[in-house]
Design a protein with these regions (language model features):
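Membrane-interface helix-boundary motifs at transmembrane edges
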Residues: 92-103, 142-147, 179-190
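Membrane-interface coil-to-helix junctions
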Residues: 21-83
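Transmembrane helices and adjacent periplasmic/lumenal helix-loop junctions
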Residues: 123, 145-181, 196-209
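Membrane-interface segments at or immediately adjacent to transmembrane helices
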Residues: 212-217
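Membrane-interface micro-motifs in multi-pass membrane enzymes
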Residues: 37, 52-56, 80, 103-148, ...
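Transmembrane alpha-helical segments of multi-pass membrane proteins
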Residues: 87, 103-114, 149-160, 188-200
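Transmembrane-helix motifs of polytopic, lipid-linked glycan transferases
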Residues: 81-99, 133-138
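Start-transfer (signal-anchor) and selected internal transmembrane alpha helices
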Residues: 1-20, 182-193
Length: 217
């Protein structure tokens, strides 16, 4: 079963949410009200069809949809703070379920703090990181067996089509989790297989799902 964070960890995540909200509300109150996705989402009828027809387009479309509420006061800051907290919470749970000795939540806050210093125009990267972290938590929640490894393969493929490059980050999480388990050859094989499958997914997709006519290529 998926473990929970302790009370101190939950309180720290709450403080991180409040701090993120205040930071982005103070420094980027109007910046996120004028995004390309906001205009395209409203004016282009083919926007959804175009995005959903390419790898990672699903998360881009979700990000574009979320930006529709950014014209509402406090909406952009609250959305970004929530996504940062979700990513931090997912990473903290992954570290806990992976059986590492590190219970320090500060490590899980690092990706969010990086976004403070290097904010992006789109919130798609936040959705991507959050998805990868929680897929890793889901993977660790399954008992080590062929079911777990099969689920990892399916989830990697799902992450590629929905939110590439989330599959690469998720594959790294799988490799880290298997390495920390230290079960000998099996863990090594699973870790390598996850990384190889994540690397091959774009090549396989280009040969099967995203074949371009010669004229377009």
């Amino acid at each position: 079963a998926i473990q929970r964070l302790n009370l101190s960890g939950s309180f720290m995540l709450l403080l991180f949410f409040v701090g993120s909200f205040l930071f982005f509300e103070w420094h980027y109150r109007y910046f996120y009200r004028f995004l390309e996705q906001f205009v395209l989402f409203q004016t282009s009828e083919s926007y959804a069809h175009t995005l959903l027809g390419e790898p990672g387009g699903g998360v881009e479309y979700m990000a574009s949809g979320l930006t529709q509420c950014f014209s509402t006061p406090f909406a952009s800051s609250a959305t970004i703070a929530l996504l940062l907290t979700l990513a931090a919470g997912g990473l903290a749970l992954f570290l806990k379920t992976a059986g590492t000795a590190s219970g320090n939540l500060w490590i899980a806050l690092l990706p969010g703090l990086l976004f403070w210093f290097f904010p992006q125009e789109s919130i798609a990267p936040l959705l991507t990181v959050s998805l990868a972290c929680w897929l890793a938590v889901l993977y660790n929640a399954i008992k080590p067996s062929w079911v777990r490894y099969g689920a990892g393969l399916v989830l990697l493929t799902f992450a590629y089509f929905l939110a590439t490059p989330a599959h690469l980050l998720f594959a790294c999480f799988i490799a880290m989790s298997e390495a920390w388990r230290r079960e000998g050859t099996k863990s090594t094989v699973v870790a390598v297989a996850a990384l190889v499958w994540a690397a091959l997914l774009p090549l396989i997709a280009m040969r099967t799902c995203y074949i371009l006519p010669m004229r377009e290529a």
